[in-house]
């Protein structure tokens, strides 16, 4: 087998949550270009339809379902829909996420719980549902963040705690499932990428962070999608329990 062939995902079925915008769109498009069929979940159905159109344009099959990952039943229903449509789930991209920037002394219990419910609890419910049906050779990729490893000048305790939790959960699920079930579990920890979420940050914030990024620029979403394709493909077959940092060198400064 040639090295390039190891990066192909022909015939694989990939679930992407948070597929209506931002990195989720790039993940869906990237996996479609690598040969996979897609099952998309998101709360914003109209925007998710645009993502589905990109998958179809790449010549791949696609199924969409409105999904709020804070609800374990909706997570199970998304996986059930994938099984009904395609008969298998090979890859989960646990991408659904929200963020806030609220000083710790002013953050309400509702604000804190809302972030953790999506970013950590929702990722767990999706992994749990997929873990029930995945066969050996399957893969889960949890989307964490460099803010689970470091700080970046904004008051984001809830977001940072949730993403640090994702990193810990990734290691434990890998320990539980990789040997016994043959399911690899890894995380990606992105730095700053050009997405809708970064567009919503306060004016001047990203400019203030650029000096910390060794490569001197924000990431392109396609670069993160390519990393996910590698990690999910046979090329990444000897990697499990790891958090792959994709941040342009932010965390080494």
What are these regions (language model features)?
Residues 179-184, 239-241:
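Short, small/polar-rich loop/turn modules that mediate ligand/substrate recognition or access, typified
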Residues 20-21:
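Conserved glycine-rich cofactor-binding loop
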Residues 145:
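Residue(s) in the substrate-gating loop at a strand-loop-helix junction
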Residues 103-104, 108-116, 198, 209:
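Substrate-binding pocket helix/loop in short-chain dehydrogenase/reductase
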Residues 132, 175-179, 237:
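Alpha-helical segment proximal to the catalytic Tyr-Lys
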Residues 2-6, 150, 228-229, 240-253:
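Short C-terminal tail/terminal secondary-structure segment
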Residues 127, 162, 170:
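Active-site helix of classical SDR
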């Amino acid at each position: 087998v040639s090295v390039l062939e190891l990066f192909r995902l022909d015939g694989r079925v990939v679930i992407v949550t948070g597929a209506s915008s931002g990195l989720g769109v790039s993940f869906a498009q990237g996996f479609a270009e690598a040969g996979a069929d897609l099952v998309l979940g998101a709360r914003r159905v109209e925007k998710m339809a645009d993502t589905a159109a990109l998958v179809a344009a790449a010549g791949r099959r696609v199924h969409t379902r409105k999904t709020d990952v804070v609800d374990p039943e909706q997570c199970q229903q998304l996986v059930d829909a994938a099984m009904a449509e395609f008969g298998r789930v090979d890859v989960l991209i646990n991408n659904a996420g929200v963020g806030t920037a609220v000083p710790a002394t002013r953050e309400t219990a509702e604000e804190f719980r809302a972030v953790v419910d999506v970013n950590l609890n929702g990722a767990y419910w999706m992994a749990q549902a997929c873990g029930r049906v995945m066969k050996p050779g399957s893969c889960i990729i949890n989307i964490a963040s460099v803010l689970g490893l470091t700080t970046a000048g904004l008051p984001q305790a809830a977001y940072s705690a949730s993403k640090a939790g994702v990193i810990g959960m990734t290691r434990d699920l890998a320990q539980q499932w990789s040997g016994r079930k043959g399911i690899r579990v890894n995380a990606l920890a992105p730095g700053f990428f050009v997405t809708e979420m970064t567009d919503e940050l306060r004016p001047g914030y990203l400019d203030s962070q650029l000096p910390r990024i060794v490569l001197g620029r924000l990431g392109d979403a396609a670069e993160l999608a390519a990393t996910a394709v590698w990690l999910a493909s046979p090329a990444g077959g000897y990697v499990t329990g790891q958090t792959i940092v994709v941040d342009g060198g932010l965390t080494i400064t």
